[in-house]
Curated annotation (Swiss-Prot):
This is Amino acid transporter AVT6C. Belongs to the amino acid/polyamine transporter 2 family. Amino acid/auxin permease (AAAP) (TC 2.A.18.6) subfamily. Pfam families: Aa_trans. It comes from the Eukaryota. GO terms for biological process: amino acid transport. Its main location: membrane. The gene is AVT6C.
Length: 435
């Protein structure tokens, strides 16, 4: 039974409204796929380097499968109650504390990803001056170094003329076209990477990849757990399931669309990780774009490297508004729980949108590095959103709809998520202390 929509985050829907129910299956798949593929694709080759090809494939498959299960858990519990948001489902199961927990987790995750996106965009366009391998931006390569193509001005232009018009869209379904373009850009990124890898393979220039990790000492074994949070983060899209699903006439449509999206994205992740690892081997960086920035020795190779970097940056620009939509909705629900619909209050809508953009822009300028933050976020915030919270909802079973099989799966999911997170956090803390 479809629940009555009472939350202020969504407009009242009429069955005859083609605008509200016009989202096609392909549009849903593109929106979900776009919200899945983000900064995570950048770190897949590094995850393959740490894990080896076979374990990486198995972990991607397992996490993708668990992601579809947890989405099913969420939607089943949602439709059994009266809520239409992730936070609302948690409130029904765990009270106000649960609602606030998922709102804060979602806001931290989405804001963190938006900052990471902005940092990567700045790195590609204007270079990275934080040490390590020299990384010159595309704008400097093409035009030389000037004040107008420095990091701050490049990001300012992107925010003002690309991101701002997109985040001012008030409904997720209106981002379907940009989502489709974004997804195709991600596919282009994979295709070009594949072409470069196959070309290198034919010419005998590929590295010798490891099928399994090297476990030469105990530290190497524990280091394997630091790659899992990166893959978990890559499949964390659960905060967008409710906004996308409840713009449909039948919210359950989002479940089969999610399965299609997860399969597509898992294939893209595996291809990116495999071909990136084949190209660069043990020299693979945590940011694969740094490797593509290296000289290829030919004009065609340099052109392909630029296309790889720019297609990826354009993809991130088009994913950005989907994350902003979720962040803005959760922040509004937390700050103004009794206010009318956000999309009907222009002053509040624009105020929140501009405030979030400004904070994200300043953070992207100030934050020097993303890697450790990326790992810690994957082992704490995103694993909670993707697995711990949905599993807890099933085990709580406030509406009495969870089956015994679902409870067993939820319990296993919860134990695996918590155990892996504890090991990953401990290993990261040990590595930081050792360094």
């Amino acid at each position: 039974m479809t629940p009555q929509i009472k939350t202020h985050l969504l407009p009242k829907q009429e069955p005859s409204s083609s605008e509200n129910h016009g989202s096609s299956t392909s549009g849903i798949v593109f929106n979900v796929s776009t919200s899945i593929i983000g900064a995570g694709i950048m770190s897949m080759p590094a995850a393959f380097k740490v894990l080896g090809i076979v374990p990486a494939f198995l972990i991607i498959t397992i996490i993708a499968w668990l992601s579809t299960i947890s989405v099913g858990f969420l939607m089943k519990s949602t439709l059994a109650g009266e809520s239409t948001t992730y936070a609302g489902v948690m409130k029904e199961s765990f009270g106000k504390t649960g609602s606030i927990a998922v709102q804060i987790a979602t806001m931290v995750a989405t804001f963190g990803c938006m900052i990471i996106f902005s940092i990567i965009i700045g790195d590609v366009l204007s270079g990275n001056e934080n040490g390590g391998p020299e990384h010159i931006g595309v704008l400097q390569e093409w035009f030389g170094s000037y004040w107008w193509n420095t990091r701050i001005f490049a990001l300012l232009f992107v925010y003002g003329f690309v991101l701002l018009p997109l985040v001012l869209r008030r409904r997720v379904e209106r981002l379907a076209i940009s989502s489709a373009v974004s997804f195709l850009l991600a596919v282009l990124f994979v295709v070009i990477s594949s072409v470069l890898a196959i070309s290198a393979l034919v010419n005998g220039q590929t590295k010798n990849p490891r099928l399994f990790p090297e476990l030469s000492n105990g530290g190497s074994f524990w280091q394997l757990f630091t790659a899992s949070p990166v893959i978990v983060t890559a499949f964390t899209f659960h905060f967008n399931v409710h906004p996308i699903g409840f713009e449909l006439k039948d919210p359950l449509q989002v479940i089969p669309a999610t399965k299609i999206s997860v399969i597509l994205c898992a294939a893209i992740y595996f291809a990116t990780g495999l071909f990136g690892y084949l190209l660069f081997g043990d020299a693979t960086m945590s940011d694969i774009l740094v490797n593509f920035d290296q000289s290829s020795g030919s004009s065609i190779g340099s052109l392909l490297n630029d296309i790889v970097r720019l297609s990826y940056v354009l993809h991130l620009m088009l994913v950005f508004p989907l994350l902003n939509f979720s962040l803005r909705a959760n922040l509004d629900e937390l700050l103004y729980p009794k206010k009318p619909s956000l999309e009907k209050d222009t002053k509040r809508f624009i105020g929140l949108t501009l405030a979030l953009l400004i904070c994200c822009f300043l953070s992207a300028i100030a934050v020097p590095d993303i890697w450790y933050f990326f790992q810690f976020m994957g082992s704490t915030i995103t694993v909670s959103i993707a697995f711990i919270f949905p599993a807890a909802i099933v085990l709580r079973n406030i509406h009495g709809v969870s089956t015994s099989r679902e409870k067993i799966v939820a319990a296993i999911m919860l134990v695996l998520a918590v155990a892996t997170s504890i090991i990953a956090i401990s290993t990261n803390l040990y590595s930081l202390a050792a360094n």
